Curated annotation (Swiss-Prot):
Cellular location(s): Cytoplasm
Lineage of the species this protein comes from: Bacteria, Pseudomonadati, Pseudomonadota, Gammaproteobacteria, Lysobacterales
UniProt GO cellular component terms: cytosol
Pfam families: TACO1_YebC_N, Transcrip_reg
Name used for this protein in its record: Probable transcriptional regulatory protein Smlt3713
Signal peptide: none
Keywords attached to this entry: Cytoplasm, DNA-binding, Transcription, Transcription regulation
Top-level taxon in the UniProt lineage: Bacteria
Major localisation: cytoplasm
Source organism: Stenotrophomonas maltophilia (strain K279a)
Length: 243
């Protein structure tokens, strides 16, 4: 029986993953600051990106440098936003949001991932209509359902979803109201375990067996691309996809 990865190898892999997460968030901060100004209090999108950085222990100095590069106070790289849409095996719809300084490279990488995993890229709008853009505040199992529901309604949330299998709770908002609802919930003593603006599918497609493995391979491959910020799908993967 062979030995597993050494402690040093595991640490290096963890550091590489952390570095990739930091790179993606720094790009997101930069694009948000360039588009709406460098003050998070007056730029909701920047506020969300900064909060995302702080949640993974990104230092305030790193965040500040990213903002200054975007606003021209420091020299930096310009990134553009691109969205690709397509289908994974089994008719699963996929949205891929990218930030890139080289559109040709990015589209080639994304197309390669779709092709390699049995999917295909579509045209703009080919799958986006199957999703809604939402703000989601997630609370782990054990959270006080009654108190969170009351606070969410008071804060102006659009919906509260309680998952019966484990009791976890999602508070759903519009993208525009996301920051205000998040702040109001926190002020009431309910800090979400995870908070993001995301796409959610109107209806999920359950995939199992070999198809589920192919879909997961594609989603993982896309998420590993340096230029890809977020990947969304309407797949409900069976347990065998994680075997």
């Amino acid at each position: 029986m062979g030995r597993g990865p050494s402690i040093e190898a595991r640490k290096n892999a963890s550091d590489a993953k952390r570095g990739k997460i930091f790179t993606k968030i720094i790009r997101e901060i930069g694009v948000a600051a360039r588009g709406g100004g460098g003050d998070p209090n007056n730029n909701p999108r920047l506020r969300v990106a900064v909060d995302k950085g702080l949640a993974v222990n990104m230092s305030k100095d790193v965040i500040e440098r990213a903002i200054k590069k975007a606003t021209g106070e420091l020299e930096g790289v310009d990134y553009e936003e691109i969205r690709y849409e397509g289908y994974a095996p089994g008719g699963v719809a996929v949205i891929v949001d990218c930030l890139t300084d080289n559109r040709v490279r990015t589209v080639a990488d994304v197309r390669h991932a779709f092709s390699k995993c049995g999917g295909n890229m579509g045209t703009e709008g080919s799958v986006a209509f199957m999703f809604k853009r939402l703000g989601v505040l997630s609370f782990a199992p054990g959270a006080d359902e009654e108190a969170i529901t009351e606070a969410a309604i008071e804060a102006g949330a659009d919906d509260i979803v309680v998952y019966p299998d484990d009791g976890s709770i999602d508070v759903v908002t519009s993208p525009d109201a996301f920051s205000a609802v998040k702040d109001a919930m926190a002020a009431a003593g309910h800090v979400a375990d995870h908070a993001e603006i995301t796409f959610r599918a109107d209806n999920d497609i359950k995939v199992e067996g070999e198809v589920a493995l192919q879909v997961k391979k594609l989603l993982d491959m896309l998420e590993d691309l340096d230029d890809v910020q977020d990947v969304y799908s309407n797949a409900e993967l069976g347990a065998d996809a994680y075997a």
